[in-house]
Amino acid sequence: MDKRTTQFLKSRFQSYYKNAEIGLPDHLPNREWAFIFYDDMPEKMMHRHKSFGSPGEALDYLYGMAPAHVYNSTAYYEYPDAKKMNEKNWLGAELIFDLDADHLPNAPRNYADMLELVKKEALKLLDFLLDDFGFSEQEIQLVFSGGRGYHFHIVSPKVLTLGSSERREIVNYVSGRDLEFKYFFREVAMDGDFGTGSKTFKGMKNVPMKCTLVGYDSGWGRRIALYLTDYMKRESEKKYKKDMFPELRRHEKVGDTTIKKLINIANSETGLKDILEKGRLDFDVRNFKEIAAYFMQESAEDFLHRFGASVDEPVTADIKRLIRVPGSLHGGSGMLVKKLALSELEEFDPLNDAVVFGERPVKITASKPFSVQLKGKDLRIEEGIQEVPEYAAVYLICRGVAEYGHRRNQPDTV
């Protein structure tokens, strides 16, 4: 990045910070801040161990310095500006989740598709935070990172003193790592109107057994119920019976009789509903506990891909992590690190809603062809000199595929 390009970006960032609404963290004097400046480019040197005593001091600093990247600590310190970490005196830390397309298997290369995929992961994580862990919406802060993902901040007092190992356990839970499916299926003595009959068999030596799904109405049990019912419905709708339930047919105790019963349950008015609302899995099928556990184990990869949340474990486990400040700009994209209400996530479009610069034409020199979708437009950039809207110029320069202005002896692109 040449000097003129650096000055252009710094001036654009400074114009933004003049009136920016920055999401300053609570307990501001107890937070460490860190910055990467355009004046250090192309080196990405982090300047850290800084603290601010008041909101005005922090905002004045951002406007005056116009940094490329802005971070604050997720931890609270007694002495946040101490130069050595062991001298800061750690007091606690928010619980942080980082979802980034870089950590998703088979993430698409197209930026818009990539962002859509990571949003789905964010929605799955949000379900865990609200349903499984019971955090209130007020305890969850959601932020678009300005790049390829989302950050979740849990600010509940219940999590502040959790250590790294406890935080890793939380990651293991939301990802479904080491999930033991056999413990979700249980055989119990049939009693009353729950299983295949309505009689009570208490006191009998040989009591009929029924298979039930443990925890069918919440947590992983609910997700297993959804997966099973979706599978049964999908398979029963196939045209030919011989093509139905191929995964179950591989089990030695599953024959045509069992398949027929499963089809009947899937096609009945109450069969699938009873799984979701009662955890009922007896179906008058012998060995169904064993069969169901086998199916879930065989389908584990697909099940966890659908329901597990892929989060960056090192970020969550790090109790002294630096994270981007909401309301700041991401120096790798020029986009806004945007705080969102939880209700906004599903409809949020980063390539429109996190773009802060305007339409003013800016001349750039692109080093290679490049395409991107911004503000509802498909922008196709050719190598060479051309004019683009300011928001596109900032994005392309931040991505490292263009310089500001034009070079001598460089032909304009028509």
Curated annotation (Swiss-Prot):
The GO cellular component terms are: DNA-directed RNA polymerase complex; primosome complex
Q: Which cofactor does it need?
A: Mg(2+); Mn(2+)
**What EC number is given for this enzyme?**
2.7.7.-
Q: Which UniProt keywords apply?
A: DNA replication, DNA-directed RNA polymerase, Magnesium, Manganese, Metal-binding, Nucleotidyltransferase, Primosome, Transcription, Transferase
Ranges that cross the membrane: none
Give the molecular function GO annotations.
DNA-directed RNA polymerase activity; metal ion binding
Entry coiled-coil feature ranges = none
Q: Which residues form the active site?
A: D98, D100, D312
Per the UniProt entry, what are the Gene Ontology biological process annotations, in alphabetical order? DNA replication, synthesis of primer
CDD domains recorded for this chain? AE_Prim_S (cd04860)
InterPro entries this protein is in?
DNA_primase_S, DNA_primase_ssu_euk/arc, DNA_primase_ssu_PriS
Assembly with partners or alone:
Heterodimer of a small subunit (PriS) and a large subunit (PriL).
- Please state which protein family the record places this protein in: Belongs to the eukaryotic-type primase small subunit family.
Question: What role is this protein assigned?
Answer: Catalytic subunit of DNA primase, an RNA polymerase that catalyzes the synthesis of short RNA molecules used as primers for DNA polymerase during DNA replication. The small subunit contains the primase catalytic core and has DNA synthesis activity on its own. Binding to the large subunit stabilizes and modulates the activity, increasing the rate of DNA synthesis while decreasing the length of the DNA fragments, and conferring RNA synthesis capability. The DNA polymerase activity may enable DNA primase to also catalyze primer extension after primer synthesis. May also play a role in DNA repair.
Stored HAMAP family: DNA_primase_sml_arc
Name of protein: DNA primase small subunit PriS
Organism encoding this protein: Methanosarcina acetivorans (strain ATCC 35395 / DSM 2834 / JCM 12185 / C2A)
The top of its lineage is:
Archaea, Methanobacteriati, Methanobacteriota, Stenosarchaea group, Methanomicrobia
